[in-house]
């Protein structure tokens, strides 16, 4: 499909396939993005988000702070995207505790997290 220059035909085939499976139903999700930290060990030239650990505007949300940011939106969303920098002190166990806490408090919310770079860092 990505190599087909006839995009209208590809879109028409996708619509036929979707209608065969789901009829005229359309599905949406409602999500929230929470940046748990801007502290990052990398210094990518294109990144304006990253801060070093000692920067005056560096922040790292602990799990309680993260949940407090999620709480006001929890009844309106079905997924949370958690993203941030490559924190020098956070281990996979930190993220396991964060994800477990989210699911314990908000079982209906799916967690979308960890980019490939974040996974490699851990």
Regions found by a protein language model. Give the residues of each.
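Core AdoMet radical
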Residues: 51-67, 73-94, 98-99, 103-122
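Active-site phosphate/pyrophosphate- and oxyanion-stabilizing loops and adjacent acidic/basic residues
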Residues: 15-16, 34, 100
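Short, flexible, glycine/charge-rich loop motifs used to bind or transfer phosphoryl groups or to couple energy/partner
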Residues: 35, 70-71
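Conserved, mostly hydrophobic/aromatic
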Residues: 14, 44, 82
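Canonical Radical SAM [4Fe-4S] cluster-binding loop centered on the CxxxCxxC motif
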Residues: 20-22, 26-65
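An N-cap/entry alpha-helix motif that binds or orients negatively charged groups
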Residues: 1-27
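Conserved short loop/turn motifs at secondary-structure junctions
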Residues: 1-2, 30-35, 84-88, 117
